């Protein structure tokens, strides 16, 4: 469930609110694989996939393909203390850029921001309770879609994952 939460949260942060999903689950060779077609409030379409357990150096991330360029991002296990890799491709000038994150260890930065919000009252710039609820609603919709084999609107879901 935690991995699904991360996948849903990534998509919501990158493309906006998810309104509906159509999902399937495949269980083979000791792996569980979710494949999810996603509809966003903006009208954009997306695809989520999650495989557990993978036979490789695990990472999570996202890929966005647009009219004027693309972004590919990878985030690694937090215990590696490794910055995320973000590549930006710009159609306008045919360039490729890799963002260097000298201080980009995401997990440490999230913990520091959380502690700062609690200890000093700093504004929360990370996910909040509404983001968490939207992520859980997305996971419930994915579970219901796997069960029914059909499209599920997030606004219509209730119950546990």
Locate each region found by the language model:
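Contiguous beta-strand/loop segments that form the cofactor/metal-binding neighborhood of enzyme cores
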Residues: 1-79, 108-122, 139-142, 159-161
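C-terminal helical cap and adjacent loop that interface with cofactors, partners, or active-site loops
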Residues: 91-161
């Amino acid at each position: 469930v935690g991995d699904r939460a991360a996948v849903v949260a990534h998509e919501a942060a990158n493309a906006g609110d998810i309104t509906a999903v159509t999902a399937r689950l495949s269980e083979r060779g000791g792996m569980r694989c979710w494949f999810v077609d996603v509809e966003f409030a903006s009208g954009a379409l997306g695809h989520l996939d999650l495989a557990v357990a993978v036979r490789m150096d695990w990472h999570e991330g996202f890929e966005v393909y647009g009219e004027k360029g693309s972004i590919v991002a990878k985030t690694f296990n937090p215990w590696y203390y490794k910055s995320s890799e973000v590549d930006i491709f710009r159609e306008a000038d045919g360039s490729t850029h890799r963002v260097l994150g000298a201080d980009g260890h995401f997990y440490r930065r999230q913990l520091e921001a959380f502690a700062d919000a609690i200890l000093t009252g700093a504004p929360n710039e990370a996910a909040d309770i509404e983001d968490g609820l939207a992520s859980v609603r997305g996971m419930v919709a994915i579970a219901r879609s796997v069960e029914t084999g059909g499209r599920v609107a997030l606004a219509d879901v209730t119950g546990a994952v």
